[in-house]
Each structure stands twice: as C-alpha cells, then as structure tokens.
Amino acid sequence: MKMRVFVTGATGFIGSAIVPELINAGHQVLGLTRSEAGVKSLMAAGVQVHRGDLSDLESLRKGAVMSDGVIHTAFTHDFSRFQEVCDQDRRVIEALGSVLAGSNRPLLITSGTGIANAAPGRPATEQDAPETCHPIPRVASEQAAASVAAKGVRVGVMRLPQVHNTVKQGLITYAIELARQKGVSAYVGDGRNRWPAAHVLDAARLYRRALEKLETGARYHAVAEEGVPLRDIAEVIGRGLRVPVISVSPEEAQSHFGWLAAFAGRDLPASSALTQERLAWRPTGPGLIADLEQMCYFDADAGVAFAPLARASR
C-alpha cells in the first residue's frame, strides 16, 4: 500500500536518505523542517513541506494527523544537555502517538543499539529490551514507544548503530574532531571494544521496509557490521589526520574524551539477524573502515564531519 509518510528530520543525515527511498518506492512524503534552507531542499526533492520543530508539539501532531504513517528521526544532538534532549524526544514520541492511537497507522521511532540490555561480550539482539535504569538517557525514546503502544499505537523502534558515509559517521564524527583538536587519535585500553555500523543508504532502505511491514512493539536493528574494534577506527582516523594513535587508560578516558567517554570504552556489538530475516533486508553498502579511508580529512567543505563537539543539530 502506498502511503503519505510524515518524516521528522527529513533534511538530516539519515532523513535525507530516507526521503528518496520512500519516493522511489511510490510513497508521498511530508517533511518537517524549521528553516528556509530546509524548505528549498525538500521542495527540490519533491517533498511536501510541513513547517515546525521538535519544540512545537502541535505542529508534530498536525503532521501525523495528515499522514498514513510516521518516521521519526529528528533529534537534537547536543550532548552537553543529553538528558534534556532525550526528555524532549520522549515528549515528541508521546505527541505523535497521541493522534495515532487506534488508527493502525504505523509510527517508527529511532533509538540506538547501545540501549539493548545484552550480556557482556554478546551482540545485542532485537529481543533484548532496554535496561530499566539505563546509564544512557536515550532509553527515554524506547520507554515512550512502550507507553504509546499501551495506548493502542502501532509503534516500532529502529535501533541505529554508527551510521556512516564518507562525510559523517555517527559518534565517530566527534572522535574525528576530537583527534583534530588534540593532535592524537585515541582509543581506551587495548581498543578491542566494538561498535556496530551500517551505511546510511542501507539504513534508509531498512526504515522504508520496516514502516511498510511494521509490527507493534517490534525492534529493528539497522546493523551491517556487528562490531568494528575501536582501535581499528582510531588507527584509520590517525592515518587520515596524520596524527599519532595512542591508548588512554579507563581512568584517563573522561579527561581525554569528555562526554564521549561514556561511549568510547564500551563494547557494544549488535546483531541484525532477526531484522534481516523478518524484513528480507540485506545490507550492501561500504563498510565503516572503507568509508573512513575514503573521506577527505582536510577538505574545509567536508561539512558536518568537523562540526563542534558540543552540538550538532538537525
């Protein structure tokens, strides 16, 4: 069935890849934006513009009412006030859900694979629920999804790994800028801890498939690579920036990485076996290391890859 899909974050890194994926599959897109540049970008892509932002809950409710389904990717990436922006995401999901209850219209929200409560050393799976008291406040998004599901909303969760291309790579974007600022590319301990990854076009394709076949309460993992060692990531960044690669102890991690220390030393492998089986999704894009090797580290126009450490909003 062809749908009119309301996409939040439609001009963001992932949203801007989802939009053409939906259009090419025959869906119509209603895209949320707050800026004139966003309006021009969406109109050029053949998208109907819906003005608003994450603080305007009424505009979000109106966008959802006007649509057959919702993909929510927008998030304020300000890690200096991470708890606050995660609480905002909870309110956004609750607002979207409030007008979808009982309608059977799908709502696909976004979370991260690191939220899963997996046993140490074992890749997180779609069956792993989030910890009740998770140390990462982004768990609020999945808690909000569970809350609206209990009220009759057909809601599912897309858990993202480090989503990448040759310009942007999730948290690794910030690690690159940190290495640029400090003159060294670092990892914690022996660097054997792992982060999962997926190319942005593979992730976009999965969002579309998940929305089309969404099951209430389902969790989907957009994982192409189960775990890339942080030492490997640090080494390719070091080569790209032409800076030394060093190990920092767990005790030194906070001083070196700042807010990124909450993630830098964690082993977060994740599997997408159930997602691939359920949605016949097969990732085909380049791997994380390949994209890091191909990016231009010294191009002033490389864009968000060198955004300020504290904030990168979309």
Where are the predicted features?
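Mid/C-terminal beta-alpha module of Rossmann-like enzyme folds, strongest
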Residues: 2-4, 206-260, 300-314
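N-terminal Rossmann NAD(P)H-binding glycine-rich loop of SDR-like oxidoreductase domains
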Residues: 3-25
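NAD(P)H-binding glycine-rich loop region in Rossmannoid oxidoreductase-like domains
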Residues: 16, 31-94
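Conserved Rossmann-fold NAD(P)-dependent oxidoreductase catalytic core, especially the SDR/UDP-sugar
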Residues: 28-30, 76, 90-135
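C-terminal amphipathic/interface module of NAD(P)-dependent oxidoreductases
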Residues: 52, 261-314
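Active-site Tyr-X1-5-Lys
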Residues: 130-157
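Glycine/proline-rich active-site loop of Rossmann-fold NAD(P)-dependent oxidoreductases
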Residues: 139, 164-174, 181, 209-220, ...
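NAD(P)-dependent short-chain dehydrogenase/reductase
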Residues: 151, 161-194
